[in-house]
Each structure stands twice: as C-alpha cells, then as structure tokens.
Amino acid sequence: MPDPGRLMVLTHPRPACGRPLEQVVAECVGAGATAIQLRDKTADSRTLLETTIRLLAITAPAGALLVVNDRLDIALAAGADGVHLGSEDLPLPSARRLSPPDFLIGYSTDDPDEARRAAAAGADYLGVGAVFGTRSKPGLADEAIGPDRVRAVRKASGLPCLGIGGITPDNAARVYATGAGIAVLSAVMSAPHPAAAVRQFHQAASPRARTPKGRRQTP
C-alpha cells in the first residue's frame, strides 16, 4: 500500500504567489513534497476532474502521490492515488469497498479511539489536527491538540499519521519527533516561494533539527 510519506501539501485553487496551481505543484514535488492533496471546495465536478488529471500528470512522473479531498468519485475517475475523507464524508467501509486494493484512503481524526475504529474500517493513513493554531481554519485556534495527541493517535491506530494545522518550519520538528509526517496548506500555498517553503520543512525533518537545544547528537 502506498504511504503519504513525510510531507503532504494541500492545495489552494489560487496560490498566493500568483502562479498557476499546476506550476506550484510541480515546484513542490520537485522540492521534495511526497504527496499532494487536491482540495477545492468550490469547483464543479468537471473542473475538479480536469484539474485532478492535470495534476496527476505532474505528480506521477515525480514519484509523488496525489489524493483528492472528499471526492472519491473524482479520485477514482481520474486514476488518482487516493482520497482523503472526514467524519461527514462517505463512510470508510463504503469507500474501501468501492476502491481498488492499492487505493490510498486517508481519514481525519484527533481521537485515539476513533483512530482505532478508522484503522479497522479501512483507513490507510490519518490526518491528525489541528496540531497548532491554523490560519486556514481560524475557529480551531483555541482547540489545538499539540504534538502529544498526534503521538497518541499514531500509537492507537498503528497507521501512518500526518499532523496538520498551524505547522510551520519553526514548529515542524516537534511534529516529526512524534514519528508522524506533516500536512501543510497555508505555509506553502501562501508563501511567495512555495518550493523554498517545502525545502524548509525538509530541513526541519532532519535528525539535527529534531534534537532538543543543548543536547548533543550521538555520532
């Protein structure tokens, strides 16, 4: 089964840098993003399908995964690598039944018990958050769960996890230290240079970056 890896970038239909989404996605996977999640709550089905097909032509040759937020029908029709679902979307057992064996299904939860149920129902990875306060969903700022909850969800589920919500290059090491990867939207899509932002996250993932200040690494 494919794995979303260490860094998933969620898209915005209009990146702040002003360049076309396809160009920004190409820059991100070229800089090392391991997965792209196409997230567009406003596009009609035809537009979303066409965008998915165009992005897949970029991600596949680069060895990155492409998952579609919410829309299993679009993901399957386009031949995407997977779909990401929430608690109000299609139930996991139904999504699993409709999908081919190697199709990746992600699920959002911050609750260890729900994470266990999601794993049993067919989820392949979990998005866990909001870890910190987030600009994309300001109402969640007071409900930040922190890295320890990410660790707890990962342990309970036994699945690959991606911390999400308010993650920046300055705090990403705290999430990577839990054994999870990260998923980011604003930190990349709002950046003037998205590829540079992706590279900063990779630097945060290095063992040196995850070593607490004042503690020397063992050679």
What role is predicted for each listed range?
Residues M1-L92, R97-Y125, I145-D148, A152, ...:
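Conserved N-terminal beta1-alpha1 strand-loop-helix module at the mouth
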Residues L38, A75, G133-G139:
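A short acidic, helix-capping loop that chelates divalent metal ions and anchors anionic groups
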